Regions:
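Signature of Asx- and small-polar-rich beta-strand/turn repeats characteristic
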Residues: 1-369
Length: 369
Protein backbone atom coordinates (compact mmCIF):
# COMPACT_ATOMS: atom_id res chain seq x y z
CA UNK A 1 0.00 0.00 0.00
CA UNK A 2 1.42 3.36 -1.00
CA UNK A 3 2.04 5.89 1.76
CA UNK A 4 2.15 9.67 1.49
CA UNK A 5 5.49 11.38 1.91
CA UNK A 6 5.21 13.33 5.16
CA UNK A 7 8.41 15.31 4.61
CA UNK A 8 8.18 19.04 3.91
CA UNK A 9 9.87 20.06 0.64
CA UNK A 10 12.05 23.12 1.26
CA UNK A 11 13.85 23.57 -2.05
CA UNK A 12 11.36 26.01 -3.62
CA UNK A 13 11.19 29.65 -2.58
CA UNK A 14 8.50 30.85 -4.99
CA UNK A 15 5.32 31.81 -3.13
CA UNK A 16 2.99 29.46 -5.02
CA UNK A 17 5.36 26.51 -4.67
CA UNK A 18 5.88 27.18 -0.96
CA UNK A 19 2.13 27.26 -0.38
CA UNK A 20 1.61 24.04 -2.37
CA UNK A 21 4.36 22.29 -0.39
CA UNK A 22 2.86 23.40 2.92
CA UNK A 23 -0.57 22.18 1.84
CA UNK A 24 0.82 18.83 0.70
CA UNK A 25 2.72 18.42 3.96
CA UNK A 26 -0.30 19.19 6.14
CA UNK A 27 -2.59 16.90 4.14
CA UNK A 28 -0.19 14.04 4.85
CA UNK A 29 -0.57 14.50 8.60
CA UNK A 30 -3.25 12.41 10.35
CA UNK A 31 -4.21 15.40 12.49
CA UNK A 32 -5.37 17.34 9.39
CA UNK A 33 -6.76 14.57 7.16
CA UNK A 34 -10.34 15.88 7.32
CA UNK A 35 -9.50 19.59 6.93
CA UNK A 36 -10.65 21.65 3.95
CA UNK A 37 -7.46 23.41 2.88
CA UNK A 38 -9.33 25.54 0.36
CA UNK A 39 -11.55 27.02 3.06
CA UNK A 40 -11.11 30.71 3.79
CA UNK A 41 -9.68 30.34 7.31
CA UNK A 42 -7.11 27.65 6.49
CA UNK A 43 -6.30 29.35 3.19
CA UNK A 44 -5.43 32.63 4.97
CA UNK A 45 -3.16 30.78 7.40
CA UNK A 46 -1.40 29.05 4.50
CA UNK A 47 -0.98 32.39 2.70
CA UNK A 48 0.58 33.90 5.82
CA UNK A 49 2.99 31.01 6.25
CA UNK A 50 3.90 31.04 2.55
CA UNK A 51 4.48 34.81 2.48
CA UNK A 52 6.66 34.62 5.59
CA UNK A 53 8.73 31.79 4.10
CA UNK A 54 9.02 33.61 0.76
CA UNK A 55 10.21 36.84 2.43
CA UNK A 56 12.73 35.02 4.60
CA UNK A 57 14.09 33.17 1.57
CA UNK A 58 14.31 36.38 -0.45
CA UNK A 59 16.08 38.25 2.36
CA UNK A 60 18.54 35.40 2.86
CA UNK A 61 19.29 35.40 -0.86
CA UNK A 62 19.80 39.17 -0.92
CA UNK A 63 22.00 38.97 2.17
CA UNK A 64 24.20 36.39 0.48
CA UNK A 65 24.38 38.55 -2.66
CA UNK A 66 25.51 41.59 -0.66
CA UNK A 67 28.41 39.59 0.82
CA UNK A 68 30.35 39.65 -2.45
CA UNK A 69 31.54 42.53 -4.62
CA UNK A 70 30.43 40.90 -7.88
CA UNK A 71 26.83 40.30 -6.81
CA UNK A 72 26.20 43.21 -4.40
CA UNK A 73 23.59 45.72 -5.56
CA UNK A 74 23.48 48.21 -2.67
CA UNK A 75 26.00 51.04 -3.01
CA UNK A 76 26.89 50.81 0.68
CA UNK A 77 27.78 47.12 0.25
CA UNK A 78 29.85 47.75 -2.88
CA UNK A 79 31.71 50.63 -1.21
CA UNK A 80 32.43 48.46 1.85
CA UNK A 81 33.88 45.66 -0.28
CA UNK A 82 35.95 48.19 -2.23
CA UNK A 83 37.33 49.60 1.02
CA UNK A 84 38.53 46.13 2.04
CA UNK A 85 40.60 46.19 -1.17
CA UNK A 86 42.07 49.57 -0.26
CA UNK A 87 40.04 51.37 -2.93
CA UNK A 88 38.69 54.87 -2.35
CA UNK A 89 35.60 55.74 -4.37
CA UNK A 90 35.64 58.94 -6.40
CA UNK A 91 33.34 61.69 -5.17
CA UNK A 92 31.55 64.34 -7.22
CA UNK A 93 34.06 66.47 -9.10
CA UNK A 94 33.74 70.21 -9.59
CA UNK A 95 34.41 71.77 -12.99
CA UNK A 96 37.60 73.81 -12.82
CA UNK A 97 39.01 76.56 -14.98
CA UNK A 98 42.30 78.44 -15.10
CA UNK A 99 42.37 82.23 -15.14
CA UNK A 100 44.82 85.12 -14.90
CA UNK A 101 43.90 87.94 -12.53
CA UNK A 102 45.50 91.37 -12.45
CA UNK A 103 44.98 93.93 -9.65
CA UNK A 104 45.55 97.59 -10.53
CA UNK A 105 47.41 98.84 -7.46
CA UNK A 106 50.76 100.25 -6.39
CA UNK A 107 50.90 98.03 -3.29
CA UNK A 108 53.98 95.84 -3.01
CA UNK A 109 52.04 92.61 -2.44
CA UNK A 110 48.46 91.45 -2.39
CA UNK A 111 46.79 88.22 -1.29
CA UNK A 112 43.89 86.46 -2.95
CA UNK A 113 42.22 84.50 -0.15
CA UNK A 114 40.79 81.02 -0.44
CA UNK A 115 37.09 81.19 -1.20
CA UNK A 116 37.43 84.23 -3.49
CA UNK A 117 34.43 83.92 -5.79
CA UNK A 118 34.16 84.54 -9.53
CA UNK A 119 30.91 84.18 -11.47
CA UNK A 120 29.87 82.92 -14.88
CA UNK A 121 26.58 82.45 -16.72
CA UNK A 122 25.54 79.40 -18.72
CA UNK A 123 22.16 79.31 -20.47
CA UNK A 124 20.79 82.02 -18.20
CA UNK A 125 21.95 80.42 -14.95
CA UNK A 126 24.68 81.94 -12.79
CA UNK A 127 27.41 79.72 -11.35
CA UNK A 128 30.09 80.55 -8.84
CA UNK A 129 33.74 79.52 -9.13
CA UNK A 130 36.02 79.79 -6.10
CA UNK A 131 39.69 79.55 -5.20
CA UNK A 132 40.68 76.92 -2.63
CA UNK A 133 44.01 78.30 -1.39
CA UNK A 134 45.51 81.63 -0.38
CA UNK A 135 47.82 83.08 -3.04
CA UNK A 136 50.16 86.03 -2.52
CA UNK A 137 51.77 87.90 -5.41
CA UNK A 138 54.13 90.86 -5.78
CA UNK A 139 53.78 94.05 -7.79
CA UNK A 140 55.43 94.03 -11.22
CA UNK A 141 55.37 97.83 -11.58
CA UNK A 142 51.80 98.87 -12.30
CA UNK A 143 49.81 95.87 -11.11
CA UNK A 144 49.85 92.73 -9.01
CA UNK A 145 49.38 89.71 -11.29
CA UNK A 146 48.02 86.32 -10.25
CA UNK A 147 48.81 83.93 -13.09
CA UNK A 148 47.31 80.49 -13.76
CA UNK A 149 44.88 80.56 -10.85
CA UNK A 150 42.71 77.45 -10.64
CA UNK A 151 39.07 78.06 -9.72
CA UNK A 152 36.41 75.45 -8.92
CA UNK A 153 32.66 75.63 -9.48
CA UNK A 154 30.60 75.57 -6.30
CA UNK A 155 30.38 76.91 -2.78
CA UNK A 156 33.39 76.94 -0.49
CA UNK A 157 32.28 75.30 2.76
CA UNK A 158 33.89 74.89 6.18
CA UNK A 159 32.72 72.22 8.64
CA UNK A 160 34.12 72.35 12.18
CA UNK A 161 34.08 69.68 14.88
CA UNK A 162 35.34 69.77 18.46
CA UNK A 163 36.96 66.45 19.31
CA UNK A 164 35.37 64.45 22.14
CA UNK A 165 37.30 61.22 22.63
CA UNK A 166 34.65 59.92 25.04
CA UNK A 167 32.12 59.89 22.18
CA UNK A 168 32.88 56.64 20.37
CA UNK A 169 30.30 57.51 17.69
CA UNK A 170 31.75 60.92 16.79
CA UNK A 171 32.33 61.30 13.07
CA UNK A 172 33.89 64.06 10.99
CA UNK A 173 31.68 64.30 7.92
CA UNK A 174 31.63 66.36 4.75
CA UNK A 175 28.02 67.37 5.18
CA UNK A 176 26.92 67.48 1.54
CA UNK A 177 26.81 64.55 -0.90
CA UNK A 178 27.98 66.94 -3.65
CA UNK A 179 31.31 67.61 -1.91
CA UNK A 180 34.40 67.36 -4.10
CA UNK A 181 36.99 65.52 -2.00
CA UNK A 182 39.81 66.57 -4.33
CA UNK A 183 39.36 70.13 -3.00
CA UNK A 184 39.41 69.04 0.65
CA UNK A 185 41.75 70.74 3.12
CA UNK A 186 41.95 69.31 6.64
CA UNK A 187 43.25 71.44 9.51
CA UNK A 188 43.41 70.68 13.22
CA UNK A 189 43.42 73.54 15.72
CA UNK A 190 44.91 72.74 19.14
CA UNK A 191 41.93 74.08 21.11
CA UNK A 192 39.48 76.96 21.36
CA UNK A 193 42.05 78.89 23.42
CA UNK A 194 45.12 77.86 21.40
CA UNK A 195 44.66 78.82 17.76
CA UNK A 196 47.80 77.03 16.58
CA UNK A 197 46.71 75.09 13.51
CA UNK A 198 48.26 72.13 11.72
CA UNK A 199 47.36 71.20 8.15
CA UNK A 200 46.99 67.44 7.71
CA UNK A 201 47.75 65.67 4.44
CA UNK A 202 45.96 62.67 3.01
CA UNK A 203 47.61 59.33 3.77
CA UNK A 204 48.73 57.44 0.68
CA UNK A 205 51.29 54.93 1.96
CA UNK A 206 50.97 53.66 5.54
CA UNK A 207 54.43 52.07 5.39
CA UNK A 208 55.90 55.57 5.49
CA UNK A 209 53.91 56.71 8.54
CA UNK A 210 55.01 57.08 12.14
CA UNK A 211 53.08 57.74 15.35
CA UNK A 212 53.63 61.47 14.78
CA UNK A 213 52.54 61.64 11.12
CA UNK A 214 49.90 64.34 10.66
CA UNK A 215 47.73 62.60 8.08
CA UNK A 216 44.04 61.87 7.63
CA UNK A 217 42.08 59.09 5.97
CA UNK A 218 38.97 59.34 3.83
CA UNK A 219 36.07 56.98 3.20
CA UNK A 220 32.53 57.03 1.83
CA UNK A 221 29.89 56.21 4.45
CA UNK A 222 26.73 54.16 4.03
CA UNK A 223 24.75 57.41 3.72
CA UNK A 224 26.76 58.55 0.69
CA UNK A 225 28.60 61.28 2.62
CA UNK A 226 32.38 61.26 2.97
CA UNK A 227 34.04 60.88 6.35
CA UNK A 228 37.47 62.02 7.49
CA UNK A 229 39.14 59.97 10.21
CA UNK A 230 42.52 59.97 11.89
CA UNK A 231 45.17 57.67 13.31
CA UNK A 232 45.27 55.92 16.66
CA UNK A 233 48.67 57.17 17.84
CA UNK A 234 50.47 54.12 16.48
CA UNK A 235 49.75 54.44 12.78
CA UNK A 236 49.79 58.26 12.45
CA UNK A 237 48.96 60.89 15.03
CA UNK A 238 45.78 60.62 17.11
CA UNK A 239 43.49 63.53 17.97
CA UNK A 240 43.18 64.84 21.52
CA UNK A 241 40.20 66.10 23.50
CA UNK A 242 39.40 69.69 22.62
CA UNK A 243 41.10 69.66 19.23
CA UNK A 244 39.04 71.44 16.59
CA UNK A 245 38.87 69.70 13.21
CA UNK A 246 38.26 72.07 10.29
CA UNK A 247 37.20 70.62 6.95
CA UNK A 248 37.24 73.00 3.97
CA UNK A 249 35.91 71.85 0.61
CA UNK A 250 33.84 72.78 -2.43
CA UNK A 251 30.20 71.70 -2.80
CA UNK A 252 29.58 71.55 -6.53
CA UNK A 253 26.80 71.35 -9.10
CA UNK A 254 28.89 68.68 -10.83
CA UNK A 255 28.55 68.75 -14.64
CA UNK A 256 26.30 71.80 -15.04
CA UNK A 257 29.09 74.37 -15.43
CA UNK A 258 31.36 72.38 -17.75
CA UNK A 259 32.38 74.59 -20.66
CA UNK A 260 32.19 77.94 -18.85
CA UNK A 261 34.53 80.33 -20.64
CA UNK A 262 33.98 83.84 -19.29
CA UNK A 263 34.29 84.87 -15.65
CA UNK A 264 33.38 88.03 -13.76
CA UNK A 265 35.46 89.19 -10.81
CA UNK A 266 34.23 89.94 -7.28
CA UNK A 267 33.76 93.59 -6.33
CA UNK A 268 37.17 93.65 -4.66
CA UNK A 269 40.17 91.45 -3.87
CA UNK A 270 42.24 92.37 -0.82
CA UNK A 271 40.79 95.89 -0.95
CA UNK A 272 41.49 96.43 -4.66
CA UNK A 273 38.54 97.15 -6.97
CA UNK A 274 40.47 97.47 -10.24
CA UNK A 275 40.40 93.84 -11.33
CA UNK A 276 41.01 92.27 -14.74
CA UNK A 277 40.20 88.61 -15.38
CA UNK A 278 41.46 86.65 -18.40
CA UNK A 279 40.47 83.06 -19.10
CA UNK A 280 43.37 80.69 -19.73
CA UNK A 281 41.34 77.48 -20.06
CA UNK A 282 37.60 76.85 -20.03
CA UNK A 283 35.88 74.98 -17.23
CA UNK A 284 36.01 71.22 -17.48
CA UNK A 285 36.24 68.11 -15.31
CA UNK A 286 32.85 68.28 -13.60
CA UNK A 287 31.48 64.78 -13.01
CA UNK A 288 29.05 62.77 -10.92
CA UNK A 289 30.16 60.39 -8.14
CA UNK A 290 31.66 57.10 -9.25
CA UNK A 291 28.95 54.61 -10.19
CA UNK A 292 28.44 51.18 -8.65
CA UNK A 293 29.47 49.55 -11.94
CA UNK A 294 32.68 51.58 -12.05
CA UNK A 295 33.56 50.68 -8.45
CA UNK A 296 33.02 46.98 -9.17
CA UNK A 297 35.31 47.21 -12.20
CA UNK A 298 38.06 49.42 -10.82
CA UNK A 299 38.42 48.25 -7.20
CA UNK A 300 39.94 44.83 -8.06
CA UNK A 301 42.13 46.39 -10.76
CA UNK A 302 43.35 49.06 -8.36
CA UNK A 303 44.14 46.38 -5.80
CA UNK A 304 46.08 44.40 -8.41
CA UNK A 305 48.06 47.51 -9.37
CA UNK A 306 49.23 47.94 -5.75
CA UNK A 307 49.78 51.66 -6.22
CA UNK A 308 52.10 51.36 -9.22
CA UNK A 309 51.64 51.57 -12.97
CA UNK A 310 53.27 48.71 -14.86
CA UNK A 311 50.71 46.88 -16.96
CA UNK A 312 48.20 48.31 -19.43
CA UNK A 313 45.36 47.71 -16.96
CA UNK A 314 47.32 49.56 -14.25
CA UNK A 315 47.50 52.66 -16.44
CA UNK A 316 43.84 52.43 -17.43
CA UNK A 317 42.70 52.19 -13.82
CA UNK A 318 44.91 55.06 -12.66
CA UNK A 319 43.85 57.28 -15.57
CA UNK A 320 40.16 56.80 -14.78
CA UNK A 321 40.80 57.59 -11.13
CA UNK A 322 42.87 60.66 -11.94
CA UNK A 323 40.33 61.97 -14.49
CA UNK A 324 36.79 60.89 -13.44
CA UNK A 325 35.28 62.44 -16.58
CA UNK A 326 37.06 59.85 -18.75
CA UNK A 327 34.53 58.06 -20.95
CA UNK A 328 37.00 55.66 -22.55
CA UNK A 329 40.75 55.13 -22.42
CA UNK A 330 43.23 53.19 -24.53
CA UNK A 331 46.79 52.46 -23.39
CA UNK A 332 49.75 50.94 -25.21
CA UNK A 333 53.47 50.67 -24.55
CA UNK A 334 56.14 52.48 -26.50
CA UNK A 335 57.44 49.11 -27.73
CA UNK A 336 54.31 49.00 -29.92
CA UNK A 337 55.17 52.35 -31.50
CA UNK A 338 53.70 55.82 -31.08
CA UNK A 339 50.54 56.87 -32.91
CA UNK A 340 50.98 59.44 -35.66
CA UNK A 341 47.76 61.47 -35.96
CA UNK A 342 48.73 62.86 -39.36
CA UNK A 343 49.07 59.43 -40.98
CA UNK A 344 46.82 57.38 -38.73
CA UNK A 345 49.45 54.66 -38.27
CA UNK A 346 51.97 53.65 -35.62
CA UNK A 347 55.58 54.72 -36.07
CA UNK A 348 58.77 53.09 -34.84
CA UNK A 349 58.93 51.76 -31.27
CA UNK A 350 59.74 54.28 -28.52
CA UNK A 351 61.03 52.29 -25.59
CA UNK A 352 60.57 53.65 -22.08
CA UNK A 353 57.31 55.43 -22.95
CA UNK A 354 53.62 54.74 -22.39
CA UNK A 355 50.94 56.26 -24.63
CA UNK A 356 47.45 57.05 -23.34
CA UNK A 357 44.50 57.98 -25.53
CA UNK A 358 41.49 59.41 -23.67
CA UNK A 359 37.93 60.12 -24.74
CA UNK A 360 36.43 62.68 -22.37
CA UNK A 361 32.79 63.20 -21.43
CA UNK A 362 33.29 66.95 -21.76
CA UNK A 363 35.51 69.52 -23.42
CA UNK A 364 39.14 69.16 -22.44
CA UNK A 365 42.51 69.67 -24.10
CA UNK A 366 44.27 66.53 -22.94
CA UNK A 367 47.55 67.55 -24.51
CA UNK A 368 47.88 70.10 -21.70
CA UNK A 369 48.10 67.39 -19.05
Amino acid sequence: MATKDKRLRVTELDFDNVKTNLKTFLKAQNEFKDYDFEGSGMNILLDTLAYNTHYLGFNANMLANEMFLDSASLRSSVVSHAKSLGYETTSSRAPYATINVSLSTDANTKTMSSGTAFTTNIDGTDYQFVTIADVTSSNTGVAVPFDSIKIYEGTYVTSSYTVDTSDVDQRFLLTDARADTSTLTVKVQNSSSDTTTTTYTKATDITQLTSASTVYYLQETDSGLYEVYFGDGTVSKALSDGNIVQLQYVVTNRTLANGASSFSSPSSIDGVTGITVTTVSNATGGSNPETIQSIKLNAPLDYAAQGRCVTVDDYKTYTKKLFPNTQAVSVWGGEDGSYDTSTGVSSNPEYGKVFISIKSTCWFFWYKI
